[in-house]
Curated annotation (Swiss-Prot):
The keyword Transport does not apply. Its EC number is 3.1.-.-. Binds 2 magnesium ions per subunit. They probably participate in the reaction catalyzed by the enzyme. May bind an additional third magnesium ion after substrate binding. Residues 1-102 are annotated as: N-domain. It comes from Pyrobaculum islandicum (strain DSM 4184 / JCM 9189 / GEO3). Structure-specific nuclease with 5'-flap endonuclease and 5'-3' exonuclease activities involved in DNA replication and repair. During DNA replication, cleaves the 5'-overhanging flap structure that is generated by displacement synthesis when DNA polymerase encounters the 5'-end of a downstream Okazaki fragment. Binds the unpaired 3'-DNA end and kinks the DNA to facilitate 5' cleavage specificity. Cleaves one nucleotide into the double-stranded DNA from the junction in flap DNA, leaving a nick for ligation. Also involved in the base excision repair (BER) pathway. Signal peptide: none annotated. This is Flap endonuclease 1. The keyword Iron does not apply. Its cofactor is Mg(2+).
C-alpha cells in the first residue's frame, strides 16, 4: 500500500519524467513484491482472470517479470530485485486486515464469474491479487535462470533496497510506493514495472518513468531532514498506521511539522490523547533503523537457457517460440554488462 497520501504533496516539479533509455548504465534496486503485484493486477486474460498454466497455477507474475526485466535490460538498466523478509510485529494486524479484504474480493470474483459479469471479474480480481510462497519462489527461480540478481531482505524489501542505494551499490530504488524515501534512498524511480500505457476510465494515458530525489522533496516541502519527512508520513498514514491521524490531511500535516518541528513534541501537545493503534515513535524508529543486510550481490550472470526453457515452456506452458525469441533478446541485452560467473558480495 505504501504512503499514498504523502505522494499528494510531491508535486510535478519534483517528478522528473524520463525515458527508459535515460537510465542506461544505472543499477536499480527493484521492490520485488511491488513489481509482482503490479504484474498480477495488470496481466490478465480477456475474461479478467490471470494467466494460468495447464494445472491452474497463476503465471501472470512470471510473464510480467520475464518480459519486463528483458525490456529494462535492453534499455541498459541493471535490475536487482529485492524480496521482503519478515515484517515488523506491528505490521501483522494490517497484513491480516488486507488478507480479509482480498478474501472478500475473491468472493465477489467467483460470484461475478458465475453470473457472467466480465467487467466485474476484472475489477474485483485486481483487489483480490495475492502472492503465495510458491509464487515468490518461482519468481526467484526465474530470475536465477535469467542470470538476474535478487536479494532476500531480512525485513522490508524497500528498506533493504534503500540501504543498497544509500551505500552507492544501486543508483535508485524502483517502486510505485514512496516508502524507500522514508528509509533514506537518495532517489526513487516510479513506473518501471508497469505497462507504459494505462487505461483510466475510457482514457488511455502514457506512463513514463519518473525520478523523485529525496533532497528535492525535503527542499520543496521545507523540511529540515528525513526525520521530519517520516513524521509527516506517520501523520498521513503508512503501512504500519494506514489511517494516520483522523482529520489530518496533507496540508494540515505539513503545517504541524513546520510548527512543532517533530513528532515527539506533537505527542506532548497537539496530539496528546490521540489514540494510535501502533506507537508512532516505534514506527519512526523502524524507518530510521530497519533490519538490513550487507550480504548481497548485484552481479549479472549468464542465463541458463535450458533451465529457462524447461521452467517456462515445459513446466508453465509458455509459448516456446516466444520464450526462445525472448532468450535471444536477453542474451543480446546482457552484452551491455560485465558478466560474472562467480558470486561476489559487497
Amino acid at each position: 500500500m505504501g504512503v499514498t497520501e504523502l505522494g499528494k504533496l510531491i508535486g510535478k516539479d519534483i517528478r522528473r519524467e524520463v525515458k527508459l533509455e535515460n537510465l542506461a548504465g544505472k543499477c536499480i534496486a527493484l521492490d520485488a513484491y511491488n513489481s509482482l503485484y503490479q504484474f498480477l493486477a495488470s496481466i490478465r486474460q480477456p475474461d479478467g482472470t490471470p494467466l494460468m498454466d495447464r494445472v491452474g497455477r497463476i503465471t501472470s507474475h512470471l510473464s510480467g517479470l520475464f518480459y519486463r526485466t528483458i525490456n529494462l535490460m535492453e534499455a541498459g538498466i541493471k535490475p536487482v530485485y529485492v524480496f521482503d523478509g519478515k515484517p515488523p510485529e506491528f505490521k501483522l494486524a494490517e497484513i491480516e486486515e488486507r488478507r480479509k479484504v482480498k478474501e472478500k474480493a475473491m468472493e465477489e470474483v467467483l460470484k461475478a464469474i458465475k453470473e457472467g459479469r466480465k467487467e466485474d471479474v476484472a475489477k474485483y480480481m485486481k483487489r483480490a491479487v495475492f502472492l503465495t510462497s510458491d509464487m515468490v519462489e518461482d519468481a526467484k527461480k526465474l530470475l536465477t535462470y535469467m542470470g538476474v540478481p535478487w536479494v532476500q531482505a531480512p525485513s522490508e524489501g524497500e528498506a533493504q533496497a534503500a540501504h543498497m542505494a544509500k551505500r552507492g551499490h544501486c543508483w535508485a530504488v524502483g517502486s510505485q510506493d514512496y516508502d524507500s524515501l522514508l528509509f533514506g534512498s537518495p532517489r526513487l524511480v516510479r513506473n518501471l514495472a508497469v505497462s507504459p500505457r494505462r487505461k483510466i476510465g475510457e482514457e488511455v494515458i502514457e506512463l513514463s518513468p519518473e525520478i523523485i530525489e529525496l533532497d528535492a522533496v525535503l527542499k520543496s516541502l521545507r523540511l529540515k531532514n528525513r526525520e521530519q519527512l517520516i513524521d509527516l508520513a506517520i501523520l498521513l498514514g503508512t503501512d504500519y498506521n494506514p489511517d494516520g491521524v483522523p482529520g489530518v490531511g496533507p496540508q494540515k500535516a505539513l503545517k504541524l511539522v513546520w510548527e512543532f518541528g517533530g513528532l515527539e513534541k506533537m505527542l506532548e501537545t497537539v496530539l496528546r490523547g490521540v489514540y494510535f493503534p501502533v506507537d508512532p515513535l516505534e514506527i519512526k524508529k523502524f524507518f530510521l533503523n530497519p533490519p538490513v543486510t550487507d550480504e548481497y550481490s548485484t552481479d549479472i550472470k549468464k542465463p541458463d537457457e535450458q533451465k529457462l526453457i524447461d521452467f517456462l515452456v515445459r513446466e508453465h506452458d509458455f509459448s516456446e517460440d516466444r520464450v526462445l525469441k525472448a532468450v535471444e533478446r536477453l542474451k543480446r541485452a546482457q552484452t551491455k554488462y560485465k558478466i560474472s560467473s562467480l558470486d561476489s558480495f559487497f
